[in-house]
Amino acid sequence: MSISVIIPTYKPQDYLWQCLDSLEAQTLDKRLWEVVLVLNGCSEPWLTEIQDYVKAHLTMRLSIIQTDTAGVSNARNIGMDNAAGEYIAFIDDDDYVSPSYLEALIQIADIDTIAASNTIGFSDEQAHIPYYLEKEYNSKAKAGKQPFYNAKKYFGGPCMKLIHRDMIGEQRFDTRFRNGEDSLFMFAISTKIRYIRFTDTNAIYYRRFRIGSASKTYTRKQALHNGWKLICQYTHLFHKGKYNRYFYKTRILGVLHSILVN
């Protein structure tokens, strides 16, 4: 198995079908990849709805795991624990990908190189929303294989990329954090990453923006508390391992910025 695609989902709506349909349409041989869908914090009627949809519409290899414990980080951890692929791809359940997404990523990924795709933001009201990672892609993609920290903005989360299992090892998402755990996870595995390389423009991760999503419902007091804990954890990791100093500084600045703008 070359790739395991991990999708956490909680009380999914119709957008999950769009996500799964986009994977069903992948050009990469279906024998080379699997989907691990983790339904977290809920059960019925969503579990039966997913099972019925998969049976009626999909031919790809897909396993469904249900856990009563809610939380995207816990769901991703469960997905990794049950994944069979040499590479891991994370996709959020309200996003979707272009047909060549997996094939383009696997062609350029390596044991020390993260493969990253083009990305486009959208919403239910707008087909195209300006997105800072689209700008980052446009400015970095043509440079070819490059040190990972050259494209530091792409390391704010695990989506839009293909990650070798050896980079992850036993590392998992820290479930103690309500926000910022995506960036913390990417920092934690960065000692195993040397390079990043981008796909062509046709391999696209479509990022949906929704009002009231988990990353948006956040008070200032919570932001301050969570931000302080993140800074402490980043610093602990930095002094514990051989992390890039420049990359560490950018993560701390990112946390401070998120506190100020909250």
Enumerate the predicted regions with their spans.
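Conserved nucleotide-sugar donor-binding catalytic segment
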Residues: 143-220
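Acidic donor-binding segment of Leloir-type glycosyltransferases
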Residues: 20-66
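Glycine-rich, basic loop-to-helix element that forms the pyrophosphate-binding segment
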Residues: 66-83
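Short aromatic/hydrophobic "clamp" motif used to bind/position activated sugar donors
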Residues: 88
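Cell-envelope/extracellular polymer assembly enzymes that use nucleotide-activated donors
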Residues: 2-4, 34, 184
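A conserved hydrophobic helix/loop-capping motif in glycosyltransferases and polysaccharide synthases
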Residues: 3-15, 19, 26, 38
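C-terminal subregions of glycosyltransferases and related glycan-biosynthesis enzymes
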Residues: 27, 184, 191, 198-262
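Flexible acidic/His/Gly-enriched loops in nucleotide-sugar-dependent glycosyltransferase catalytic domains
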Residues: 59, 98-167
